[in-house]
Amino acid sequence: GIANLIPGVSGGTMAVITGVYEDFLESINHFFQDFRRSVSFLLPYGIGIITAILLGSRLIAKCLEVVPIPTMSLFIGFIAGGVPVLYRPIQKNFQIKNICIFLGAVTLVLIFLFLPTADKSATDLQPYEYILLLASGFLASVAMVLPGISGMMIFMLFGYYQTLMNALSGLLKASTLWHSLTILIPIAIGVLLGLFTACRIFSHLLKKYPKQSYFAILGFVIASMICVFYKMLAYEFQIVQGIVGLIMVLLGFCITYYLSLIHISEPTRHAQIS
């Protein structure tokens, strides 16, 4: 949930490196066919995501304002810690085709990084822009499911990142609750539509083209680290923050790598990729 709040960081990436990505896709894809199982799997993650977004929007904004380099370094570490578990099942499949898929995935994410962005005030929204909010929610949810592409980057491209963050913060205040809901409801509708669409497509690709899919995912994940590092360059570098940043990278790496080791100790689909 917190990963989805930071431009350049993908919630899909965090799902991959913690080992729940394929199960997440399957649960969304078969939500109505296997309702009870899907809800039992998705409910804890849903509660965690909603809680993190509601409580984390202000915290992340404050951390990025006060200690941007350590904060982004922690997320670089989180992402880097998942690379070994992604590399392991594909290490014997380095054909030219797969390498091209990897490079294509990296390139796709970097294209999003260098697209021009804008932002608008929540008070400037026109009636037609609620359709744009729905469309941005749809595309952002597709991006969130796809590892490496940040959903928040989509909102920045549409110019609604600050509008979204203000609306999320406004949910906690009675005076701004209704205004926040008028912004978040069309976004939520778009997110749900995009989520079901994207999960169906990506689940099919993982089943039919597992090796190629994991090369693409690895490319997305590597590129997402480049995106976060690139955004760090916009901040003034200080030696103390740099040292703390390195510590945070190591901390994030160790946490995610430990979680990935727990995941691969269980039977997984990764073992079937050969």
Please report, for each region that a protein language model flagged, where it lies by residue.
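Multi-pass membrane proteins that catalyze or facilitate reactions on polyprenyl-/lipid-phosphate substrates
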Residues: 1-4, 10-265
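Single conserved hydrophobic/aromatic residue that forms the stacking wall/gate
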Residues: 262-274
